[in-house]
């Protein structure tokens, strides 16, 4: 399984266009050791030619320009991407579908709850239905594994996780199963497994066992502390109120990752306020000392 990180930042990217927090100001002026990052999305493939997009970022055009393998150039109009899997209906995971409209029809895999949001509050399915066949909806049963034609060796097992629907969704304060999923992706040829959960509000015993059984875990790294948005003065909500588990301290994701012995451990969906973006920070050093990697745009993993 080939895994390519198209984007590794949380909503707004890094630097966020209107933000002057120490990180955004620092990377913009070149005064901190940090990489520019686009909003989170990854692509996976079993042959290096045909790819599945996991979430469609607002930055997808630039991401695909930088990702040369996504353009096999076999004909006048071509792409290596004809399938998109959505983990949720967040704007930073779905607005990229509008940019992909020239490639319609596109197969879009999502749960019924996500489909409801994307035909009402943010009706992207409706908006694109006249674009050469539009978006072709494939329902994900959050309790059943599925496969995608053309990717015979890859199996996808959804996992219902605790997080939050987007603010525009009627499910925001009325959670439903399927608002958010993680994916266990198994390559039956290599017998390797990826656990992908860019939006994760809680780690329980089931998730711990799944992570231990995986060869790579790529999970939510939005915030270093739960009150980070408040402490930096850019917001009033905690990480948990937004559906994101913080990294540090008791109960943080790092305390769980440190219990894992075998998998490659990667944090993705990093908010622009997170000190781990500064590669000279004590927080980045702490992750490195614990064999936890911070995803970056263009990062490649082979399983």
UniProtKB/Swiss-Prot annotation:
Pathway given in the UniProt record: Cofactor biosynthesis; pyrroloquinoline quinone biosynthesis
A Pfam cross-reference name: Lactamase_B_2
Keyword Transcription in record: no
InterPro entries found in the cross-reference section: Metallo-B-lactamas, PQQ_synth_PqqB, RibonucZ/Hydroxyglut_hydro
GO biological process, one term: pyrroloquinoline quinone biosynthetic process
Keyword match Protein biosynthesis: no
Keywords: PQQ biosynthesis, Transport
Family per similarity comment: Belongs to the PqqB family.
Function: May be involved in the transport of PQQ or its precursor to the periplasm.
Protein known as: Coenzyme PQQ synthesis protein B
Organism: Acinetobacter baumannii (strain AB0057)
């Amino acid at each position: 399984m080939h895994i390519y990180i198209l984007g590794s930042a949380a909503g707004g990217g890094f630097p966020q266009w209107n933000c002057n927090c120490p990180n955004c100001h620092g990377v913009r002026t070149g005064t901190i050791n940090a990489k520019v990052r686009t909003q989170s999305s990854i692509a996976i493939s079993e042959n290096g030619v045909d790819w599945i997009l996991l979430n469609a970022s607002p930055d997808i055009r630039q991401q695909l320009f930088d990702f040369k393998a996504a353009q096999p150039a076999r004909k006048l109009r071509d792409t290596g991407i004809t399938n998109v899997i959505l983990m949720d209906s967040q704007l930073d995971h779905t607005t990229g579908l509008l940019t992909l409209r020239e490639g319609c029809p596109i197969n879009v895999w999502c749960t019924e709850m996500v489909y409801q949001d994307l035909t009402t509050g943010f009706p992207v399915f409706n908006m694109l239905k006249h674009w050469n066949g539009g978006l072709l909806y494939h329902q994900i049963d959050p309790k059943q594994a599925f496969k995608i034609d053309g990717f015979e060796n890859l199996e996808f097992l959804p996992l219902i996780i605790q997080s939050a629907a987007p603010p525009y969704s009627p499910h925001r304060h009325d959670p439903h199963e399927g608002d958010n999923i993680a994916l266990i992706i198994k390559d039956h040829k290599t017998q390797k497994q990826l656990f992908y959960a860019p939006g994760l509000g809680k780690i329980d015993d089931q998730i711990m066992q799944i992570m231990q059984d995986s060869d790579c875990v790529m999970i939510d790294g939005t915030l270093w502390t739960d009150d980070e948005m408040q402490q930096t003065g850019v917001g009033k909500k905690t990480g948990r109120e937004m559906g994101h588990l913080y990294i540090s301290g008791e109960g943080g994701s790092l305390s769980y990752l440190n219990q894992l012995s075998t998998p490659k451990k990667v944090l993705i969906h990093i908010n622009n306020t997170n000190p781990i973006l500064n590669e000279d920070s004590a927080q980045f050093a702490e992750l490195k000392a614990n064999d936890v990697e911070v995803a970056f745009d263009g990062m490649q993993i082979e399983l």
